[in-house]
Amino acid sequence: IVEAGTPSPWISRLFDEIGHKEIVANPRKLGAIYKSDNKTDERDAEMLARIGRFDPKLLHAIQHSSLKHQRDRKVVDAREALVGVRTKLINYVRSSLKSFGIFLPKGTSAATFAKITKEHLSDKDYLLFESAIQTIAELSERIKEAEKDIDALIEQDYPEALRLQAVAGVG
């Protein structure tokens, strides 16, 4: 019995490869685990074992995605992480500039933020934020590359996603 978590897909595949039957328990469906006030790995493992021995159905077993699907999902996750980092940097620069009384035009897109920011700052002010602004520009390029990778992946392996992208506001 394995508790679902970050390493559980790998552990599940490893058990399959060596011929062991595993149950990947969904801890969110097990109040005895996620509602516990005195959580430890040892107590959780013991509780999973006891429940599994009593009635495995109570573990609400999950089935992990295939390794291919897991890898494909990481392409999307990487893009999401890049967007998150870029957003934090943009918010940092915007709020810092406001403290100097500098306000960027409304509607400045994340993709053009670096260019527009450079156009609206004096050389002296630009130097204060140069590394952040250049990083934002580089992140925007990396995000474009990630989007191309995702589009290629969709076209090659997930054509059903193209239909979702055809609906305005979706995908």
Please identify what each model-predicted range represents.
Residues I1-G171:
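A detector of single, family-specific signature residues
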